[in-house]
């Protein structure tokens, strides 16, 4: 099993090395196509690993929007749900996300943080700038892994 994982990691790193040498347009088109194909096959609700293991950075605009939605003051929201990390950013105090329901639905989906809205960042432009982030996300997000597999075909 470890050998297969090493081979897969090697192929992924080789692909990243190849993609770094390609034009931005080429890389963006490959990611866009693979992203669309993968998300026709995968539902994030089947996994929700990002909500269980990754803490998003929460912007001040997110804090205002979410606290208003759940009907508490900004100060109470910050006190009850957030902490300041080593980069001086607001992040969740606890994981899994306190807004993740048992069926993997998000109780604040309509107003979820912008970092959650954008995750896994595979359908934006300038994908060459995101490659190292994608490598870090592969262990957490099966969709990112499948996107790399599709691009590598």
Q: Language model features by range: what are they?
A:
Residues 1-153:
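Short loop/turn segments that flank or connect secondary-structure elements
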């Amino acid at each position: 099993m470890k050998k297969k994982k090493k081979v897969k990691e090697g192929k992924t790193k080789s692909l990243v090395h190849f993609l770094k040498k390609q034009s931005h347009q080429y890389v963006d088109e490959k990611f866009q196509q693979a992203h669309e194909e993968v998300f026709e096959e995968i539902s994030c609700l089947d996994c929700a690993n990002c909500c269980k293991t990754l803490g998003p950075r929460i912007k001040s605009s997110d804090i205002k929007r979410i606290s208003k939605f759940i009907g508490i003051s900004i100060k109470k929201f910050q006190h009850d749900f957030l902490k300041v990390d080593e980069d001086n950013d607001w992040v969740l105090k606890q994981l899994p996300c306190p807004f993740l329901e048992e069926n993997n639905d998000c109780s604040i989906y309509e107003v979820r943080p912008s970092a959650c809205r954008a995750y896994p960042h595979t359908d934006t432009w300038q994908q060459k700038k995101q490659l190292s982030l994608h490598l870090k996300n592969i262990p957490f997000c099966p969709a990112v892994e499948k996107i790399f597999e599709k691009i590598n075909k």
